[in-house]
Amino acid sequence: MQSPIEHTVGIYIGLLLLACIVSIISKLITRLPYTIFLTLVGLGISFFPFVPDIKETGFGHELIFFVFLPPLLFQGAFHMELNRLLKHIWPIVCFAIPGVVVSTLLTGGFIGLVGGIGFGLIPLLFGALISPTDPVSVLAIFREANAPEDLRILVEGESLFNDATGVVVFTILLHALIDGGGFSIGGSVLAFIKVCGGGFLLGAAVGWMAFLILRRLNEHLLENAICLLLAYGAFWLAEMMHVSGVIAVVAAGLLIGNHGRRLAMSHKTIETVETFFESIDFLLNSLLFILIGLELREYSEVLVFPWQFAAAAIAGMLIGRAIVTYTFYWALNKIGTKRPKSWKHIIFWGGLRGSIPIALLLHLPLNTGTVLDNYRPILLVAGFGCVFFSLVAQGTTMAPLMRRLGIGRI
């Protein structure tokens, strides 16, 4: 007779084994993103009677925030070169902060109108959770094509910061919806400034303390453990202080990935930390996409209607992204550094959705006693539809688009 903990551990071992097998098959057979196959396999196997229910995994919406998000965000921030980031800070900030807010309004407004649910917190919540981008596969194409470094920094930097902005906006809207206190623009702006500013200061502070410790060590395994502790500790402490854990992790990751990498880490330590977090990134991404497949089984009876809503969501996602990208790019070229016009098409089409929207979808709470309970199944299916379309349609056509525009060497 298995104990509950043995049963849960066995389930996760099986899921990780499945993730590895699916990833190997996807690499050998096709160039489609392995995450798509993981989701489809997760959805497919969930209908077999021997496959455990999603609830048996011990999975809960809080697990996503406190276990999955910190290392995923830290890994992205650790690899970001601060000097290059600062060179393009204004376009990155414009795309990532006002851009995400405008995209949330446009996407939410469109799906509220076309999807027939009206304009309110539900469509805005969806607009916020689908706004963060995840250009991992696009950046791989950039490396293969030897694309301009400045273009890579623009795309990667925007993704890093719009992940943070999207999560903060999502959290503010979710609390307004669940708490029932209503929504005001002024209050939301103040809350945004408070949680972002507080998260940044806290992340910088704990990151600096970690740097001081790392500078006195020369043990790569211990230093790697400190980086992992920093990712989770910064997130947990920020959330306990009611500021943004996402911003805190990004700030700490940027500090350690630049200042710490240069002044406190040996080459062996850097290699250890990079390899470790890349492995964690793969494992957590794999689990996320299998879990969304298992989660969709819970709502298999509503899979017919929401696909109509998903079509509206995909259109809204693309329209919102297009308006923000082309408008902001045009304005920035008028008042600042001139960048090639062809880049705006890459920035628009390269805004793939991936692990962060999936994590936010899975973070939607159950049994809130609000209107969210009625719309959660629809949001899950529509969100999955957006991510699926993004990874398949956009991810597989990036290389031909770059070839057509004469960017890089493809």
Show the residue positions of the predicted features.
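Transmembrane helical cores of multi-pass secondary ion antiporters/exchangers
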Residues: 1-410
